[in-house]
C-alpha cells in the first residue's frame, strides 16, 4: 500500500531548507511513500534543483500562494490566508489525496485550521496534542495534552486517555496500554477537583488505568500513556527539552576544562554518543493532533532536517497503522458506567501552545 503524505513545506522557522531535504531523505528509505510538497512552486522547485531531485517520480508539488508565519494570529490563518501552505496541505488530507499532513507551522494556527478543515470525530469534544517523551525503558512515554487545552473538564481527560490508548495500541502494538493520570501524588485524595473526578472516570472506564502518576514517572516509563491538561503538559514538555539541553551543555563544559578531561571525552565518546542518541529530543519530534477526522502531525518550528524527518516518520507510522479509524472505532460505543454518554462541554478554546 502506498502512503501519501502532504508536507507543509513553507512552515516553521526554516521552511524549505528543512522540510524538503527531510522529505527526500525519508523517501529514499521508504519505497511505499509518495510526497505532496505543498507551498510556493518556485521556492520548492529551487530547493529541489539544489538537491538534484527535480525528476523524482514520487514527489508531487501542490501550489499554495501564502505562508502562515510563526507569529500569525489564529484569525489570520483562518480568515485571511485561505491559500496558505498549511491549509492546502491539510485539505489534501480532507480530500483524500493524502493520508496525513506534517507541518512545522505555529501550533495555534495549525490546530485551529486543522479543526476547521477536518472537523472532530464523533464523540470527541476537544482535540489534543500528543507526543512521546524519552523514558529509561527506551520506548518513550506518550503524553497528552501538550498545549491545545489549558483548561479541561474531567471528561476531557478521559477522552484524551481513550484517544491515546487507541493510538498506542496500533502504533506500538500494545493491545492494552497502561494509562497514568498526572498528579501531585499517587494517592487518590491528591490533586484538584478536576483531576480527582477524572481519576474516578478513568477507574470506571474499560481502559487499563494504572492510577495517579507523578512527573518523574514520565521518565521512568511507569505507564505507556500519561494524561494531563494542556497547561501542565506544555510546561512538562518544555522543561524536558530545557533539561536535556542543559545536561548536554554541562557535559561539553566539563569535558573541555583541561587536556585530561578532553582525553577522557575521547575515551568516553562511544558511551556519550549512545547517551546522546537516547535523549536526543529530535528523535521524538512530531506530535499528533488527536481527535480530528484526519491525521495531522506537528513538528517543532525550530526543527532541523533530522528532526523533521522523525515527524514525517510519526505521520507514516500513524497512517500505516490506521490510527484515525482506530480512534473513531473506540468512540463509537463509548458510554459511562451508568450507560449514558459522558457529558462534554461544547466550548472550544483556541490552542495555547507556542
Curated annotation (Swiss-Prot):
Q: Which InterPro entries match?
A: FA_synthesis (IPR003664), Phospholipid_synth_PlsX-like (IPR012281)
Q: Which GO terms describe its molecular function?
A: phosphate:acyl-[acyl carrier protein] acyltransferase activity
Q: Subcellular localization, per the record? A: Cytoplasm
Q: Which reaction does it catalyse?
A: a fatty acyl-[ACP] + phosphate = an acyl phosphate + holo-[ACP]
Question: Per its UniProt entry, which superkingdom is the organism in?
Answer: Bacteria
The processes (GO biological process) annotated in the record are: fatty acid biosynthetic process; phospholipid biosynthetic process
| This protein's GO CC annotations | cytoplasm
Q: How does it assemble?
A: Homodimer. Probably interacts with PlsY.
In terms of NCBIfam families, this protein maps to:
plsX
> Which family is it part of?
Belongs to the PlsX family.
Kindly provide the name given to this protein in its UniProt entry.
Phosphate acyltransferase
Q: Which organism is it from?
A: Ralstonia nicotianae (strain ATCC BAA-1114 / GMI1000)
Q: Which gene encodes it?
A: plsX
Amino acid at each position: 500500500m502506498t502512503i501519501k503524505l502532504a508536507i507543509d513545506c513553507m512552515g516553521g522557522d526554516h521552511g524549505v531548507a528543512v522540510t524538503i531535504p527531510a522529505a527526500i531523505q525519508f523517501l529514499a528509505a521508504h519505497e511505499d511513500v509518495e510526497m505532496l510538497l505543498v507551498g510556493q512552486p518556485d521556492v520548492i522547485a529551487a530547493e529541489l534543483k539544489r538537491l538534484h531531485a527535480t525528476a523524482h517520480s514520487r514527489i508531487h508539488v501542490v501550489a499554495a500562494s501564502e505562508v502562515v508565519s510563526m507569529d500569525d494570529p489564529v484569525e489570520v490563518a483562518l480568515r485571511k490566508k485561505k491559500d496558505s501552505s498549511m491549509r492546502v496541505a491539510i485539505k489534501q488530507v480532507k480530500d483524500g489525496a493524502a493520508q496525513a499532513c506534517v507541518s512545522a507551522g505555529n501550533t495555534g494556527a495549525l490546530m485551529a485550521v486543522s479543526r476547521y478543515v477536518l472537523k472532530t470525530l464523533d464523540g470527541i469534544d476537544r482535540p489534543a496534542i500528543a507526543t512521546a517523551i524519552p523514558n529509561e525503558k527506551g520506548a518513550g512515554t506518550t503524553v497528552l495534552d501538550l498545549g491545545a487545552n489549558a483548561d479541561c473538564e474531567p471528561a476531557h481527560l478521559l477522552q484524551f486517555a481513550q484517544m491515546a490508548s487507541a493510538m498506542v495500541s496500533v502504533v506500538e502494538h500494545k493491545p492494552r496500554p497502561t494509562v497514568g493520570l498526572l498528579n501531585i501524588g499517587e494517592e487518590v485524595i491528591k490533586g484538584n477537583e478536576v483531576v480527582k473526578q477524572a481519576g474516578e472516570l478513568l477507574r470506571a472506564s474499560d481502559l487499563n488505568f494504572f492510577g495517579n502518576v507523578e512527573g518523574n514517572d514520565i521518565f521512568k516509563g511507569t505507564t505507556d500513556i500519561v494524561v494531563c491538561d494542556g497547561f501542565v503538559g506544555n510546561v512538562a514538555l518544555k522543561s524536558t527539552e530545557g533539561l536535556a539541553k542543559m545536561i548536554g551543555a554541562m557535559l561539553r563544559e566539563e569535558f573541555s576544562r583541561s587536556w585530561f578531561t578532553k582525553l577522557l571525552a575521547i575515551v568516553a565518546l562511544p558511551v556519550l554518543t549512545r547517551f546522546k542518541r537516547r535523549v536526543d529530543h529530535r528523535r521524538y519530534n512530531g506530535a499528533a493532533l488527536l481527535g480530528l477526522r484526519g491525521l495531522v502531525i506537528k513538528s517543532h518550528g525550530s526543527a532541523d532536517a533530522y528532526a523533521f524527518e522523525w515527524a514525517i516518520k510519526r505521520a507514516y507510522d500513524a497512517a500505516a497503522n490506521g490510527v484515525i479509524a482506530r480512534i473513531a472505532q473506540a468512540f463509537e460505543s463509548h458510554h459511562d458506567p451508568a450507560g449514558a454518554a459522558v457529558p462534554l462541554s461544547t466550548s472550544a478554546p483556541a490552542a495555547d501552545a507556542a
